[in-house]
A protein has these predicted regions:
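His/Asp/Glu-enriched, well-ordered alpha-helical/loop segment
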Residues: 330-340, 344-370, 375, 380-384, ...
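Non-cysteine beta-strand/loop elements that form the S-adenosyl-L-methionine
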Residues: 65, 281-301, 391-401
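Conserved catalytic core of nucleotide polymerization and phosphodiester-bond processing enzymes
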Residues: 522
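Short loop/turn motifs at secondary-structure junctions and domain boundaries
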Residues: 11-15, 281-282, 485, 516-519
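Acidic (Asp/Glu)-rich catalytic clusters
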Residues: 246-248, 274-281, 365, 386-388
Length: 537
């Protein structure tokens, strides 16, 4: 079936704008003026009036946690109840009371940020959660996902005591010689054996919920790190859940799996069983090896080359030794895998660059597209190394909304002066894609576009390093064609052009004609996947 979409301002990804386009068999057939498209239509052509909307390629969130988003949607969502510690605890107690069927089981919540608490400028602790309940285990995850707090019941279940040794790459919070309920990074894995994992049907429901939210923000493609969401669930089950949803026609987002592995034996089995081989389908593909290099800036676990300016007793930490990271990256590179490694602190970035440089020296590859996820705190010498190694950058411009308030106080003026330098890297020839790291942030693309263009927070704080601001075109491209480049899909996705997948988003206003500080107010009218509407406001 041939369909004509008309009466629109169409940003194709090229320099010029169009008015209309034709779609046939899930792909763009032609793009041009309305007159040109009418000449290619006949009596059987279906016509869709886009009512003057702004059309761009479907948004591509190049790093997020899709299953994690689905899990949050089925848990206590704390992000809108973090104005104070007392408010968050009241909401958590009310949530538990409203879900009596869950009492006696684990109570999960996510989204809090202690920097927003008006009544207590500190992390919650076990005593705070014990006030909600000690009858059942409670775990609340900080927005960043690199720190959680549990109550006494959860600590007892996991056997975490004053004598428990934290695993490498993690930390157990202590107060007066006893665990205070705070667990950082790899220490959170101590809970894994005691949390009942979801079954495949529950995973599928999480994916359905998450896809609906992504579509509502105009997102039609997601590059997702799912395997780490529930460590007790094997990667085969995640893959089966996605492929069954694809087969039933319920997968409304094109997914590229950033395959998270922490050990060489697990990665080796994944590769030897052929899980990372082949192109996959147009809806579900296996992408790079994904690893977490360090923690987060907000929790002060990102690994810096010097101590934190506002916590001189710590510089954060890397989650793995340099030797282990080198082995993982070298194995993946030698077997044709792309790698994407989370690095927020500059000391962690040093390790990532060392590992990639070693791997490419051992097994050179012309178009490896190895990448750094986040790439936030950096030094000028590292920006040059990134360019020399031709790294892909998975940026999250939306992080500036919060980080504008903390980066200078956290890392000091010297490091802050060369951080979040994504425009510099782009001008140096690197491909910079954009994303949300959802559920760390909402997958709100237009909010991310505004942060990229203004370098300001939503409350007006900033601009932070305004010379690093993107143009509107660069910002839109970072959420479309650059995302496709991250996954080697730029030949058929990320543009509105003949032969490309007919994934597009319709906005209610033109970003090129919108005042920069109002970009976040632009709404999504509809989202289309392969020419089929998957969301309509």
């Amino acid at each position: 079936m041939r369909t004509l979409y008309h009466n629109a301002r169409v940003y194709t990804g090229a320099e010029t704008f169009s008015e209309a386009f034709l779609v046939e068999d899930g792909r763009f057939l032609a793009v041009g003026t309305e007159t040109q498209m009418l000449s290619l239509s006949d009596a059987d052509t279906v016509r869709v009036d886009l009512e003057g909307g702004f059309v761009c390629p479907g948004f591509n969130d190049s790093h997020m946690h899709l299953v994690g988003l689905g899990h949050v949607l089925d848990s206590a969502q704390l992000d809108r109840h973090t104005g104070s510690l007392s408010e968050m605890l009241r909401f958590l107690a009310a949530y538990a009371a409203q879900h009596p069927s869950r009492q006696g089981r684990w109570l999960f919540g996510r989204g809090w940020n202690q920097d927003y608490f008006s009544d207590a400028a500190r992390l919650p602790n076990r005593a705070d959660l014990d006030a909600v309940s000690t009858d059942y285990p409670i775990q609340i995850m900080r927005a960043c996902g690199h720190c959680c707090v549990v109550n006494s019941r959860a600590l007892a279940l996991a056997g975490i005591t004053a004598d428990t040794t934290a695993p490498a790459g993690g930390a157990i919070g202590m107060e007066n010689g006893q665990p205070d309920g705070r667990l950082y990074d790899n220490a959170m894995d101590l809970l894994t054996p005691f949390i009942p994992p979801p079954d495949k049907e529950e995973l599928k429901q999480m994916i359905r919920l998450a896809c609906g939210v992504l579509n509502s923000y105009g997102v039609t493609s997601a590059q997702t790190d799912d395997y780490c969401t529930f460590r007790a669930v094997n990667w085969e089950t995640y893959n089966e859940a996605y492929r069954e949803l694809e087969a039933s026609g319920e997968l409304t987002v094109r997914v590229n799996q950033q395959a998270n592995f922490t050990t060489l034996p697990a990665l080796r089995r994944f590769v030897e069983e052929g899980a990372c081989g082949g192109p996959g389908s147009l809806l579900y593909r296996i992408g790079p090896l994904k690893m977490l290099g360090d923690g987060a800036l907000g929790a002060r676990t990102a690994h810096l080359s010097r101590n934190y300016a506002d916590r001189p007793d710590t510089c954060g930490f890397s989650l793995y030794s340099a030797e282990h990271l080198n082995k993982m990256v070298s194995y993946a590179n030698a077997h044709g895998m792309q790698v994407a490694i989370h690095a927020i602190g500059d000391a962690c970035l040093d390790r990532v660059l060392d590992a990639v440089e070693l791997a490419l020296r051992e097994h050179p590859r012309d178009d490896h597209r190895h990448g750094v996820v986040h790439c936030q705190i950096s030094r000028p010498d590292q920006l040059e190394r990134l360019r020399r190694l031709n790294m892909h950058i998975y940026a999250q411009s939306v992080f500036l909304d919060y980080d504008n308030h903390i980066v200078l106080s956290r890392v000091g003026p010297e490091l802050a002066a060369s951080s979040y330098s994504w425009k510099t890297l782009m001008e140096g020839g690197l491909s910079v894609s954009n994303g949300s790291d959802c559920p760390v942030e909402l997958p709100d693309v237009m909010r991310g576009v505004e942060c990229a263009v203004t370098r300001c927070s939503m409350d007006g704080t900033g601009p932070y390093l305004p010379g690093e601001a993107f143009t509107v075109r660069e910002a839109l491209d970072s959420y479309t064609i650059r995302g496709a480049e991250a996954s080697f899909e730029e030949g058929f996705k990320g543009r509105i052009a003949p032969g490309y997948l007919a994934d597009f988003t319709v906005l209610d206003r033109d970003p090129f004609e919108t005042e920069p500080r109002s970009l976040h107010t632009i709404g999504v009218r509809s989202a289309w996947l392969g020419g089929s509407c998957v969301y309509e406001a």
